[in-house]
From Swiss-Prot:
The DRBM domain, residue ranges: 162-231
Lineage summary: Bacteria, Pseudomonadati, Bdellovibrionota, Bdellovibrionia, Bdellovibrionales
Protein name, per record: Ribonuclease 3
EC number: 3.1.26.3
Start and end residues of each RNase III domain: 6-134
Uppermost EC category: hydrolase
Functional description taken from the UniProt entry: Digests double-stranded RNA. Involved in the processing of primary rRNA transcript to yield the immediate precursors to the large and small rRNAs (23S and 16S). Processes some mRNAs, and tRNAs when they are encoded in the rRNA operon. Processes pre-crRNA and tracrRNA of type II CRISPR loci if present in the organism.
SMART domains reported in the protein's UniProt record: DSRM, RIBOc
Organism: Bdellovibrio bacteriovorus (strain ATCC 15356 / DSM 50701 / NCIMB 9529 / HD100)
Subcellular location per the Swiss-Prot or TrEMBL entry: Cytoplasm
Binding sites annotated in the UniProt record for Mg(2+): 47, 120, 123
Superkingdom field: Bacteria
Reaction it catalyzes: Endonucleolytic cleavage to 5'-phosphomonoester
Amino acid sequence: MIDQGRKSLEERVGHQFKNPALLERALTHKSFANELRNTVEHNEKLEFLGDAVLDLVVGEFLYEKFPTDTEGGLSKKRASIVNEEVLSELALEMGLNKLMQLGKGEALTGGAQKPRLIASSFEAIVGALYLDGGFEVARSFIRQEFVPLADRVCGHEDFERDYKTRLQELVQKSSKETPRYEVLAEEGPPHDREFLVCVKVKEDVWAQGRGRSKKNAEQMAAKNALEMKYKETN
């Protein structure tokens, strides 16, 4: 990783690494290490550690924000916001895809744009921060970058209702078809993206929906389809 890229990333995360090798490892994919016959360390173990820290900090946030929720409700919220889509969006906004070290084969197949790889780099950064600066440093970073997005997603009035599942049940009951969702547009800056999604049955567009994430936009499209096709309003 070039020094300027590392410096910019350290400024973004609000921490100067005492052990720069940790930051380097966090952005090193296994394919890169394999090509060098494992003479460098890759980020899988840091990803594992970062995932655990992320779950804890987001769990803490949800516990504070929704004090009357059940354990099941909190788990559902966490699963909806700690996922590949959200993490990859954050990683892209931070430019981690431009700093990742990939093997030649992985790079040629578009590895720097694969949500799974990009999301794993975010988790690895969290793990590196935890090891280099301790829990509070990692917690501060997550709160800064992740919690505001989680706040918007969980704060949406339609969060609790699973409209996609309901729509699929009704469509399959009547026609055996499965609704499909397509992204029509992405608007706004990376840190405040809004998605426009349509829901189709066969090739017919039933409805559209907007949301701060693809999943939220899909839920809104399903909700609108339920209202238009089945007259369901709640």
